[in-house]
Amino acid sequence: MRAIETYKTIKTGLFQDETLFLYCYIAHNGLKYETTGATLDICRKSRDIWLSHLSASFTGHRQVISCRQTAERVKDAIRYCYKNGIRFFYAGGAVGFDTIAAEAVLSLKEELTDIVLIIVVPFPGQDKYFKMENKKRYMNIFNRADEVVTVSGSFSNIAYLKRNDYMISHSCQLIAYWDGKSLGGTSYTVRKALDKKLPIYNLYKNRL
């Protein structure tokens, strides 16, 4: 199911000279959010805040120790977040932990029927230089995701950071696979989450 956004306007005020937006958003899993605002932008920002309180993001290294064990740890983390009200999960679609996490969400859809997978890509064709096996896994999660968000129209190093910023700004929790030392996109995202004071569940070496 695709998310559906509808709205209409009415005239308000003593002289009927003010416009009020009556806004309704139905998410991919059927959850409904309604609000009113003076502009459509105000309504959408209010919706995004509501969604962020129901959302978690993933970040992690491309090299993963014991992929099968890590996948089970991710599933446990998803179930834990689900029990605490999380329904939307954002993944970046990169090789390694991102792919494992996205596949874990998809594998739990029969068990947790209202969870939503949103893939956030830095630019179109980020899989261009993936190895064939990784490309196949990427296209599988890309095609099965409930939504795909593209943050930039073309390749740039900044696009990767914009992707990470987008996920953090739309989430209230972070599920990470971070060794605590390495620099790069995972470290950047964890530090952004720390700055925002988000709960972080680090699955590296069985930590949750």
PLM features: residue spans?
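Intrinsically disordered, low-complexity regulatory regions of eukaryotic regulatory proteins
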Residues: 3, 15-16, 32, 46, ...
